[in-house]
Amino acid sequence: MSFRSSSSYSVQSKNVSGGGGFGSSYGGGSSSSFGGGYGAGFGGGYGAGFGGGASSGFSSSSSGGFGAAAASSSFSSFGGNDKQTMQNLNDRLASYLEKVRALEAANADLELKIREWYEKQKGSGIGAASKDFSKYFEIISDLRNKILFATIDNPRVVLQIDDAKLAADDFRLKFENELALRQSVEADINGLRRVLDELTLARGDLEMQIESLTEELAYLKKNHEEEMSIAKGSAAGQVTVEMDAAPGVDLNKILSDMRADYETLAEKNRRDAELWFNQK
């Protein structure tokens, strides 16, 4: 904005100062521009003194423009260097005008760049004024509703989590109890397997005894049949033979005793196993 104010001032100064040669330049413009600096010497002397030209202005125009007293006092201050002074003033004015034109050009270029920058910002949508957020309102409203529903549903989810934790703890206790019971049953099974092995060994022993006694019984039956056949032959020959033989062996009684012993042993093993199981 500082360049804009300088531009306005420069244009006004240019319009006033750029009259028509030396007569109009210092006649109308320099009375205001240089009036404070040069006083009476430049305040209004050049407005009429140089009206007809720089060559004859000192002799003819000075008497009519200022009067005799004013012309003598003005020209006495310049002396013989009036052309040099005018040339210096003209050079200074030209340099000033060049600076004004350069500042105007720089100002115009800067204004163009600023305008292009604003147009670019509007085109790209980066500027806050050019952004349209209306398309996000529906998304924001939907997200707010979801957040509200999630906030309302959160206590229910927390309650379900607590219920699940309690159920998990209950199942954990049940699992631990069942695991302890399973270990106890497995220990009992292992103990019963040892008892079963012992009973199997006892059964094998008894079966071997039964087989041995069966063979002995068959041998005794064979001997008995042979003795009976010999006795029948002797009776047919009218021969009476008195023998002092040992009494016969009752095999049925032996088998009954063996069976009773086996049942007694089995019952004893069963009671021992039951007692061991109850103690566990």
Swiss-Prot record:
Alphabetical keyword list: Coiled coil, Intermediate filament, Keratin
Region (Coil 1A): 82-117
Region (Coil 2), start-end ranges: 255-280
Protein name: Keratin, type I cytoskeletal 47 kDa
SMART domains in the record: Filament
InterPro entries found in the cross-reference section: IF_rod_dom (IPR039008), Keratin_I (IPR002957)
Domain of life: Eukaryota
Pfam families named in the record: Filament
Region (Head): 1-81
Molecular function GO terms recorded: structural molecule activity
Residues covered by region (Coil 1B): 140-231
Family of this protein: Belongs to the intermediate filament family.
Residue ranges of domain IF rod in the record: 82-280
Region (Linker 1): 118-139
Protein's organism: Xenopus laevis (African clawed frog)
Paired cysteines (S-S): none
Linker 12: annotated segments: 232-254
GO biological process: epithelial cell differentiation; intermediate filament organization
Keyword Coiled coil: yes
Assembly: Heterotetramer of two type I and two type II keratins.
Other facts: There are two types of cytoskeletal and microfibrillar keratin: I (acidic; 40-55 kDa) and II (neutral to basic; 56-70 kDa).
Assigned GO CC terms: cytoskeleton; intermediate filament
